[in-house]
Amino acid sequence: MLSTALRSSSLTIHSFKLKPISYSYHSSHHPLWSGLQTWRDSSLNHNRFWGPSGPQPEPPIDPDSQVGSVTSLAEMGAMVLSTSDPLTKSRLSHLAYSRWRKEKLSVGVSQPPHRPARPPKPQLVSPKDIPAPKNSGLPLNAYMLHNLAHVELNAIDLAWDTVVRFSPYSELLGDMFFADFARVADDESRHFAWCSQRLAELGFSYGDMPAHNLLWRECEKSSDDVVARLAVIPLVQEARGLDAGPRLVQKLIGFGDKRTSNVVAKIAEEEVAHVAVGVYWFVSVCQQMGRAPCPTFRDLLKEYNVEVKGPFNYSAREEAGLPRDWYDPLKESKEDEERLSKVHDRLAHIISMEKENSNLNREE
């Protein structure tokens, strides 16, 4: 629950009520992604089909009777989480977000399932048991695309779980928090639709090879902690997409699959917004708690045993507003060395001056 947002802090539900989250965000140390407000204000994105030249609108989707029967964002999110078929989950996600935007429904309150519903395939195994490309039965481009589809499907559930799980605290967090993560869920559902379409064009489908459940296990770690959820999911898991995206694009180009590389490049471009949303809300909640974001982020990673691995795409992370000193120990070590070097230089200068003064005194 929100009252355990940071176990080492003095945050309580009552103190949070006295100081509701402010939407102002001014800090020279944490510059926002320049496109955040444009992303928030943009109209519904119906470009869920990948055409000859890129994303384009798909044929109109008939409204789902289930989505039409509920009256709040949280209830619709719980419905998406309880849907096992991946393509249906993707479609319902878009319908739910569209209805909430068009009808201006309330956030409401609901409870998420213990785990999101999943199809019989793919088989979920330990990450070490994921077959190598040559043993997967898929060509390299389909192998990489299947892995990305799995990430995007999990990302749909991760975003909706954040909406639903913390819906009892909508008065504390504010509607914008839920609007942001519902939009993230809609983006992820579009990304999965593109991956699924491209897999079908290659003659494969999601579920044709095993996948891991690592992403959801990371989500479960933060099920009672909104600050940890923000740290672990957008600032670690989503940020890994910024690192991996350009490398994946280059591998696909090298394989000769330009169309799939274009899909992946567009997904990587849109993931910047998701990391930026995480940074915005993580810093906002930390400010509300009177905690410095950088040490708080590091403390949470240690507490929840979350490892941040490189290589890092520093430029994309910086664009999203994620400061390098939060996650890169090498930067901190380098800064320490530079500080020590400056101290050493100052001491050497002082010693040199003392020697000169001593020599002058002797000459006198």
Language-model features: locations:
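Non-heme di-metal
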Residues: 2-364
